[in-house]
């Protein structure tokens, strides 16, 4: 109840007590309640209870004609506050509204009751109380009640009355009017809030009597007269006055009555007992039908009978409205009297007293609730029956439906109330269904609609009313006459009677009468047949004679003006149904669906709330409707009352398109909405009826009638407390389903459980009730709002055997089963339990019983957007299941603080690829498994404080990616004593480490100082920090990069430091560590002691708007360069995939920067032409490198896009169900302009800004062509550059299909089309010895150039179609797991760069072995239309002409990355696609982990990034992935610079894996990779160089020896023959010829002496030389020995000898 309603209750109480007759009424009500407690009726009216406080009676009178729907809440039941409690605040509030009316209306109403012959309360008492009320009431209040004003009101309402057929009702005697008034009073507390505005307006329009007159006349007058003539006046005067007033009241009051009635039922139900003839009338909103879609339900649980009559005539529209109305109906149910009133009524005396008051006051509300008004006429007819035979007459909403087509109302008085519902199936069947549903709910009690309310309301009444209810209900048969009687046309006699009996308490009156008279009368008159005048031929009547709450509803066929025969038949059924008496006082009244549904065709609903009652719904087929003809299937619970609902087939027949069943056990309303099939025959199935075990049965009119009008939707709501529910539905041969009837929201707002698929079959319903747990009455309303949520198990709900029977049509139409609803409730309602919004799911501050025990898994459609922040703080989560994060793949921030986690496993966070913030503080974590954080490559922050971690074992922070982004780690407040994980100290980006309040030793500090070189802030335990502070000066002197911040506590602390000896020793290990740190890092480290109030939490308020990993264009483009080659390698359409994300930030760039692109195209050309120019540019223009790179990228991307469109068919766009134009359209037109993201991608803005502007969509090449032509001049250079770059890239990839960009383009300059081995041999040492900067530059620049060529090349050129395969060259591609053998064979075979496809020859030209991915053999992706080829089909031997990788959008779910190639059977095409990517990338990326990451990112980008809401997130993921690859590559470059190895090494070895396992695995991979891709380490290359050098040396030596040998062969000319030694074996001719050739060659430019150098000497010459030498020597001797006198001249002889 709203707060506004509570004041209304107070007002009501004050007024009730203010009235004199109330004490008498209270006494009588108490007496009646003791005998039989009848549940409040639900009045299913367009009007809902309003929270508005009751105005003074004067205001009522003054505004009688314009009573707002809320006004009905005038103080009605002042009797006892506890009565109000039973009713519920809303009920009480609503009940007060009628008091103004009650003064005058009660008197006639009481008289009517007396005249009707019902149990008259002691006339003196009633008269006294009513007279007192009259005296207290102002004349204005009396005026509205006066029949004259009522007549005036009918005059005003006459137009409506004519439409509905009110004319006849108006013609009916005043007794009918009084009856209506009584009914209005009983239904006086409708739910005004639920009334549609139109209804409210109408209610306002009538003069004072509109609400007051109608309801007040009926109720106030009878009550005023109650002491003496309560019964008489009701029967006579009300019947007399009613005819005149009915037309007015029926139109205006139905709503008000419905509104007021709910409030009144609780108390008034008991008071109504004083008015035995009071019936609860629910008039379908005939006049208020103009207010479509607003059904009101009024329930007076305590000892209240409900009369519901609905006319189907011309209510087909109304039925549709009603179908819609049920949606509103739930609203009414929650606030409405059902919940509110039911609780208030339990006290017997107050309820009786209040009921009468409510009846009096309810007239004010009848105007608001047309349904109630309708019921009132029916009630008028009902008075004709003896009070003992009190019937609840539900007038079909014929006339009122005309006005309130969409607002059916149902009144139910569960306890000891027999309910007769007569409804005309004509077009109103839908409405009647609504009434039936409403009635069913009403039976539960005020809160019946909301299951809890029923429990509250019902149970209190049950004890008293149960006893009384049984007999009273049986004796009193509430007959629901078609609303025509309300109109005073057809049912006028019946209505007059009903009114006479139930004039004041259409709802209460019946209940009160039931309570009063039922004890004696119930057994005798179990069946009450209300004959409907021929005018009501269309109305179906349902008589319910519960023992305690036997409820029989028999719908009459439209043609049947003779509803009475139908009702006669109905009585026959009611006795069966009456068999068990409800343990609970509650009675269920279901208006015939025909009547109410006719009026409210859109929203038929049957609500049955039973405490211990069986509810049997027997639809009586009218000749016209035919739905009544099929027998009802009744399921009788053995112990509990049996509820029979209209056969699902009937309901289905009319609601063929939708069937819903809502079951709310205990106080839960059971809503059954069967999908009616056109077949009317289902009724046969309905025929089956099981007698209730011992509980009264409630028979509802066949849902068929209601369905006929609500063809698309019928709703039955049953709220039992220990009851069995039997639902029998007869399909109407006539199916008049308004197409909107399905929309009738079968979902009662208060229903805890909704069984949509098979409501008709009681099996499903009762079963569902058993399965479902009934929510507490106080929580029912909340639960009702979510139909899928099941709040509690039914108390003791036993399904009848017949419930197993379901109509075929219903089974066919069933969409969900009860178990499915249960399942949905656990996952679908996360956003109801938690807070969803702004990309955040917050499940905090929950009640202890609601707190989460495990991570909730939402349904895919639960939330339209994505959750980037998950906050599960303060729950009871103790374990994290695997794959639980699959639905949260985009989460960046996860808070699991203050839960019960005890351990973390390596799969605890599997699937959170994008996670950056992880808060696990204040749990009970004791151990962390190795590789726990490996699934989180982008993690930046971890909070593990406030746990019970005692050690960090080896591998805790081990991950293949090395935790490259982790910069903050909090470990404080843990009993941490040992840190054995070296990976903690080696975290490359760690800048903040908090180890405060731990027990770590000094050794840990040493390791941190020595190994964690990037650490900037370290928080130590206070004792250790203070110990260091004692040597602050020494430490800072030794290592200037370490700064100690000592607080005052440390400076004054003189405690002995256990580490003093080690720290204070200048030559100790600690000082050496400091010196070593100073040598290899310049990062300043601040060491601080822990703060006394240290809080481990970190304020990340701006976390959601976090920047991308790269802040400028150069970084962004450079990061993309590391992943673009992989996209082309797997034949993905890079342009269509990446451009949307690259273009996202373009909106933030300045136009001036974009204009510089054209000027720098020449620079791009130079960049692309070769590595030499790149090196120069790198060294000369490092500062401008980023800008040029971006410009080059832009030019190349544009060229690629344009050239590709011109030369080849447009590549097929990534399929996006949400958009026809593809991702680029999204990116161009619906780009997020998030400032943070714009800044992050600021670099890419200029790159593709013109392109994004010029070609917003790649799916429209025709539009792009003109722009291509316009740019032809600008693209000239870029195209030529790309062509040359493509050739180099192709050659590179041909010889080395390696993943890393650096490797690919390492040898552009020297690459030749030869085998890999030959290429390696010819490498120049200079190339191998390039500086680290040069290699890094090549990796960053040239790869991206090549990638750009991949994007821009035409389909038939290198990297055609961005890697798409050509059908001509590779017609077949059998995809399977790539084995090393295949890769080796393929690479050796296809070494020549034949064309661009050679780079992918390892996949294109090979038949891969089968069986590797046998799990996927059955998967064949549906081919997609594409001009280039067929879609990629996966299988053991799948053939494809072109690998487009175009998959349907599977969703955003991301499966965990596969651990190996032995994948389990996959559940989605996305998983299979990822496997294929992994296999394709195997040769490019030998490292399994890197390969899986790249495959996963590509799969995400391809299949999960189509939605506009994930564009930014996808762009972030791409940027982070590229940044990660850049960091990993940089680390490998550092290693390469140290050991002079080639960049290919990174493929052979894992990046970070330094463990023994990684090393052993690395060796195996190295051997395999040597086979796959010829490549050698430094050692192998050195050996090879030495070998080559040796071979060359040997060759040179051999050559020299051969030449010498040839020269010496010439000595053979010597006569003596010169021995050739070892060379004599050489052929002579060969040697001579060679010598001649050599002589010929040497003849040019050689001196003569050199020619004869090796010429052999003849023997003569030798002898001559020897003689000369000998002679010379002898001559020298002579000269030395000659005497001085000797002649110096030689002798002639000597001279002659000397001559030759």
UniProtKB/Swiss-Prot annotation:
Q: Where in the cell is it found?
A: Membrane
Q: What broad class describes the main subcellular location of this protein? A: membrane
**Intervals, Cytoplasmic compartment:** 1604-1700
A single Gene Ontology CC term: membrane
Compositional bias annotation for Basic and acidic residues: 1182-1191, 1201-1216, 1676-1685
Q: Where is the composition biased (Low complexity)?
A: 238-249, 358-368, 482-493, 729-749
Q: Which Pfam families match?
A: LRR_8, LRRC37, LRRC37AB_C
InterPro entries hit by this protein? Leu-rich_rpt, Leu-rich_rpt_typical-subtyp, LRR_dom_sf, LRRC37, LRRC37_N, LRRC37AB_C
Membrane topology, from the record: Single-pass type I membrane protein
Give me the LRR repeat coordinates as residue ranges. 866-887, 890-911, 914-935, 938-959, 965-986
Sorted alphabetically, the keyword list is:
Glycoprotein, Leucine-rich repeat, Membrane, Repeat, Signal, Transmembrane, Transmembrane helix
Which interval of the chain is the signal sequence? 1-35
Disordered as annotated region, ranges: 54-104, 130-156, 169-534, 559-580, 619-642, 685-708, 729-751, 758-777, 1182-1227, 1250-1271, 1676-1700
State the source organism's domain of life.
Eukaryota
Chain intervals with Acidic residues compositional bias: 1689-1700
What stretches pass through the bilayer? 1583-1603
What Gene3D superfamilies does the database record attribute to this sequence? Answer: Ribonuclease Inhibitor
Question: PROSITE patterns, alphabetically?
Answer: LRR (PS51450)
- Locate the compositionally biased regions of type Polar residues: 54-65, 169-189, 223-237, 307-326, 433-446, 760-770
| Residue intervals annotated with topology Extracellular | 36-1582
Glycan attachment points: 296, 1079
Question: What family does the database annotate?
Answer: Belongs to the LRRC37A family.
What this protein is called in its record is Leucine-rich repeat-containing protein 37A
Species source reads: Homo sapiens
């Amino acid at each position: 109840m709203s707060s506004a309603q509570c004041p209304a209750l107070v007002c009501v109480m004050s007024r009730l007590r203010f009235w004199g007759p109330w004490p008498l009424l209270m006494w009588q009500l108490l007496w009646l309640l003791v005998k039989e407690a009848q549940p409040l009726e639900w009045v299913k009216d367009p009007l809902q209870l309003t929270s508005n406080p009751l105005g003074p009676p004067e205001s009522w009178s003054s505004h009688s004609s314009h009573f707002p729907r809320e006004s009905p809440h005038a103080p009605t039941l002042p009797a006892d506050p506890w009565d109000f409690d039973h009713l519920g605040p809303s009920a009480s509030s609503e009940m007060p509204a009628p008091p103004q009316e009650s003064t005058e209306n009660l008197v006639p109403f009481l008289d009517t009751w007396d005249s009707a012959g019902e149990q008259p309360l002691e006339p003196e008492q009633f008269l006294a109380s009513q007279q007192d009320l009259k005296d207290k009431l102002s004349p204005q209040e009396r005026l509205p009640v006066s029949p004259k004003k009522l007549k005036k009101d009918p005059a005003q309402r006459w137009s409506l009355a004519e439409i509905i057929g009110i004319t006849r009702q108006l013609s009916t005697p005043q007794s009918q009017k009084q009856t209506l008034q009584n009914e209005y009073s009983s239904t006086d507390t409708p739910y005004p809030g639920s009334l549609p505005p139109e209804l409210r307006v109408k209610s306002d329009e009538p003069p004072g009597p509109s609400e007051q007159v109608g309801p007040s006349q009926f109720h106030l007058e009878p009550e005023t007269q109650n002491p003496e003539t309560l019964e008489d006046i009701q029967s006579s005067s009300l019947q007399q006055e009613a005819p005149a007033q009915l037309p007015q009241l029926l139109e205006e009051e139905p709503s008000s009555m419905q509104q007021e009635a709910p409030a009144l039922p609780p108390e008034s139900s008991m008071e109504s007992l004083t008015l035995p003839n009071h019936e609860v009338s629910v008039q379908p909103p005939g006049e208020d039908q103009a207010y479509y879609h607003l059904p009101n339900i009024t329930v007076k649980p305590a000892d209240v009978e409900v009369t519901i009559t609905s006319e189907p005539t011309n209510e087909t529209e109304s039925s549709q409205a009603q179908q819609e109305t049920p949606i509103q109906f739930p609203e009414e149910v929650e606030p409405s009297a059902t919940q509110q009133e039911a609780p208030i009524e339990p006290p017997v005396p107050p309820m009786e007293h209040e009921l009468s008051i409510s009846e009096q006051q309810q007239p004010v509300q009848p105007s608001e609730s047309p349904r109630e008004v309708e019921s009132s006429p029916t009630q008028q007819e009902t008075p004709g029956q003896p009070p003992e035979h009190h019937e609840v007459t539900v007038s079909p909403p014929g006339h009122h439906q005309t006005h309130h087509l969409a607002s059916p109302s149902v009144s139910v008085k569960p306890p000891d109330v027999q309910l007769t519902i007569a409804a005309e199936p004509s077009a109103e069947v839908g409405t009647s269904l609504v009434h039936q549903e409403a009635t069913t709910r009403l039976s539960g009690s005020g809160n019946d609609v909301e299951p809890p309310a029923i429990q509250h309301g019902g149970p209190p009444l049950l004890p008293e009313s149960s006893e009384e209810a049984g007999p009273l209900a049986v004796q009193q048969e509430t007959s629901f006459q078609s609303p025509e009687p309300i109109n005073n046309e057809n049912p006028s006699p019946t209505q007059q009677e009903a009114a006479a009996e139930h004039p004041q308490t259409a709802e209460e009156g019946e209940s009160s009468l039931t309570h009063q008279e039922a004890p004696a009368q119930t057994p005798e008159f179990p069946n009450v047949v209300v004959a409907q005048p021929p005018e009501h031929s269309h109305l179906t009547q349902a008589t319910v004679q519960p023992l305690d709450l036997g409820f029989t509803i028999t719908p009459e066929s439209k043609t049947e003006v003779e509803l009475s025969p139908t009702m006669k038949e109905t009585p026959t059924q009611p006795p069966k149904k009456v068999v068990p008496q409800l343990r609970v006082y509650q009675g269920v009244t279901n208006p015939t669906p025909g009547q109410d549904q006719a009026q409210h065709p859109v929203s038929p609903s049957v609500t049955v709330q039973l405490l211990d009652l069986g509810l049997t719904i027997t639809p009586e087929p009218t000749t016209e409707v035919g739905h009544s003809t099929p027998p009802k299937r009744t399921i009788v619970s053995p112990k509990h009352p049996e509820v029979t609902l209209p056969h699902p087939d009937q309901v289905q027949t009319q609601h063929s398109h939708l069937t819903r069943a809502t079951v709310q056990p205990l106080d839960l309303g059971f809503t059954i909405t069967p999908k009616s099939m056109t077949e009317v025959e289902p009724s046969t199935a309905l025929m089956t009826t099981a007698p209730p075990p011992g509980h009264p049965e409630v028979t509802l009119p066949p849902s068929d009638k209601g369905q006929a009008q609500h063809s698309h939707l019928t709703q039955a709501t049953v709220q039992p407390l220990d009851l069995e529910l039997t639902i029998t539905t007869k399909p109407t041969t006539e199916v008049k389903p308004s197409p909107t009837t399905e929309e009738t929201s079968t979902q009662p707002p208060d229903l805890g459980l909704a069984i949509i698929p098979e409501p008709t079959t009681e099996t499903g319903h009762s079963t569902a009730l058993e399965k479902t747990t009934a929510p507490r009455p106080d929580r029912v309303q909340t639960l009702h709002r979510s139909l899928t949520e099941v709040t509690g198990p039914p108390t003791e709900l036993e399904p009848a055997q017949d419930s197993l029977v379901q109509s075929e049509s219903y089974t066919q139409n069933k969409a969900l089963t009860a178990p499915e609803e249960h399942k949905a409730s656990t996952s679908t309602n996360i956003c109801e339990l938690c807070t969803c919004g702004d990309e955040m799911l917050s499940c905090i501050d929950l009640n202890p019983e609601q707190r989460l025990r495990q991570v909730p898994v939402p349904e895919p459609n639960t939330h339209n957007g994505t959750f980037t922040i998950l906050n599960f703080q303060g729950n009871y989560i103790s374990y994290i299941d695997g794959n639980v994060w699959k639905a949260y793949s985009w989460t960046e921030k996860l808070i699991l603080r203050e839960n019960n986690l005890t351990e973390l496993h390596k799969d605890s966070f599997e699937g959170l690829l994008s996670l950056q913030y992880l808060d696990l503080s204040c749990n009970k974590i004791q151990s962390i498994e190795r590789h726990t954080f490996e699934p989180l490559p982008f993690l930046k922050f971890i909070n593990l404080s406030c746990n019970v971690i005692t050690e960090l074992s080896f591998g805790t922070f081990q991950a293949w990616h090395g935790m490259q982004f982790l910069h903050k780690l909090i470990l404080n407040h843990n009993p941490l004593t040992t840190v054995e994980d070296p990976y903690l100290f080696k975290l490359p980006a760690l800048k903040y480490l908090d180890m405060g309040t731990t027990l770590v030793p000094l050794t840990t500090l040493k390791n941190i100082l020595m190994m964690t070189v990037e650490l900037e802030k370290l928080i130590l335990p206070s004792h250790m920090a203070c110990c260091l502070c004692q040597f602050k000066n020494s430490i800072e002197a030794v290592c200037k990069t370490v700064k100690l911040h000592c607080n005052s506590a440390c400076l004054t602390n003189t405690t002995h430091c256990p580490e003093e000896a080690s720290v204070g020793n200048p030559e100790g290990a600690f000082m050496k560590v400091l010196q070593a740190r100073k040598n290899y890092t310049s990062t300043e480290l601040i060491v601080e002691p822990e703060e006394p109030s240290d809080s481990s939490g970190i304020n990340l308020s701006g976390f959601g708007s976090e920047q991308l990993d790269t802040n400028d264009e150069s970084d962004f483009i450079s990061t993309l360069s590391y992943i673009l080659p992989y996209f082309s390698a797997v034949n993905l359409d890079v342009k269509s995939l990446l451009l949307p994300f690259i273009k996202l930030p373009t909106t933030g760039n300045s136009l001036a920067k974009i204009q510089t692109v054209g000027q720098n195209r020449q620079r791009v050309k130079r960049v692309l032409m070769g590595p030499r120019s790149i090196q120069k540019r790198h060294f000369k223009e490092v500062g401008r490198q980023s800008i040029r790179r971006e410009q080059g990228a832009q030019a190349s991307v544009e060229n690629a896009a344009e050239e590709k469109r011109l030369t080849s068919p447009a590549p097929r766009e990534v399929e996006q169900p949400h958009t026809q134009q593809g991702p680029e359209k999204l990116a161009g037109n619906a780009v997020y302009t998030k400032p943070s993201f714009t800044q992050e991608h600021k670099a890419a803005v200029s790159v593709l800004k013109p392109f994004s502007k010029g070609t917003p969509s790649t799916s429209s090449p025709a539009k792009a062509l003109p722009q291509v032509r316009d740019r032809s001049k600008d693209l000239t250079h870029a195209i030529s550059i790309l062509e040359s770059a493509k050739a180099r890239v192709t050659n590179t990839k041909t010889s080395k299909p390696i993943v890393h960009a650096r490797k690919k383009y390492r040898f552009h300059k020297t690459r030749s089309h030869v085998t890999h081995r030959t290429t390696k041999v010819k490498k120049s040492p200079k190339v191998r010895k390039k500086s680290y900067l040069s290699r890094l530059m090549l990796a960053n620049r040239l790869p991206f150039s090549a990638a750009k060529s991949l994007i821009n090349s035409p389909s038939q050129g290198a990297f055609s179609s961005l890697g798409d395969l050509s059908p001509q060259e590779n017609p077949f591609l059998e995809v399977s797991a790539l084995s090393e053998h295949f890769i080796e064979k393929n690479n050796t075979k296809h070494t020549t760069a034949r064309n661009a496809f050679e780079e992918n020859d390892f996949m294109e030209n090979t038949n891969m072995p089968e069986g590797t991915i046998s799990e996927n053999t059955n998967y064949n992706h549906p081919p997609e239309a594409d001009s280039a080829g067929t879609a990629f089909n996966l299988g053991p031997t799948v053939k494809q002409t072109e690998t487009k990788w175009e998959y349907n959008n599977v969703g955003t779910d991301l499966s965990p990355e596969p651990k190996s190639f032995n994948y389990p059977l996959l559940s989605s095409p996305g998983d299979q696609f990822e496997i294929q990517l992994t296999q394709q990338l195997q040769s490019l990326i030998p490292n399994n982990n890197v390969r899986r990451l790249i495959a996963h990112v590509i799969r995400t980008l391809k299949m999960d990034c189509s939605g506009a809401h994930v564009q930014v997130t996808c762009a972030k993921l791409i940027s982070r992935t590229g940044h990660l690859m850049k960091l990993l590559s940089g680390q490998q470059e550092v290693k390469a610079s140290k050991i002079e190895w080639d960049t290919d090494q990174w493929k052979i070895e894992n990046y970070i894996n330094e463990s023994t396992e990684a090393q052993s695995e690395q060796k195996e991979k190295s051997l395999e990779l040597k086979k796959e891709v010829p490549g050698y380490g430094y050692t192998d290359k050195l050996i090879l160089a030495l070998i080559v050098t040796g071979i060359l040396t040997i060759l040179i030596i051999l050559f020299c020896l051969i030449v010498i040998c040839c020269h010496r062969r010439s000595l053979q000319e010597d006569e003596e023959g010169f021995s050739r030694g070892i060379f004599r074996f050489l052929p002579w001719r060969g040697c001579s010829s060679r010598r001649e050739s050599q002589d010929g060659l040497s003849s040019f430019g050689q001196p003569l002496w050199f020619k004869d150098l090796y010429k052999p000497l003849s023997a003569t010459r030798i002898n001559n030389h020897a003689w000369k030498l000998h002679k010379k020597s002898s001559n020298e001797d002579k000269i030395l020995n000659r005497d001085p006198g000797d002649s110096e001249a030689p002798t002639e002889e000597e001279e002659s000898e000397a001559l030759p």
